[in-house]
Amino acid sequence: MHWKDEGYLLSKINYDENSIIIEVFTLEHGKCTGMVYGGSSRKQKRNFQVGNKLLLNWRSKNVNKNGYFTSELI
C-alpha cells in the first residue's frame, strides 16, 4: 500500500541509532504512525521537529501494519 499526503508532526521517538518513529496527523488519513530511516541524521533532523508541516509518502506491505515514511518539509 502507498499513499501521499500532507500532515503535521505530533511526536517522535528515537529508535535504533539512525531511525525514528513518528506520529503525524494527515488531512486524508488521520493519525498515523511509522518509521523514518535516517531520521536522526544531521541532514534530516531539522525536518522532524514537533509541529512541522510535512509532505509525506507512506509505504507498507499491509494496510493494518506500521509503515515507512519518507518526507519533505513544506
In which residue ranges do the predicted regions lie?
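A surface-exposed, charged beta-strand/loop segment in the N-terminal or early-internal portion
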Residues: M1-I74
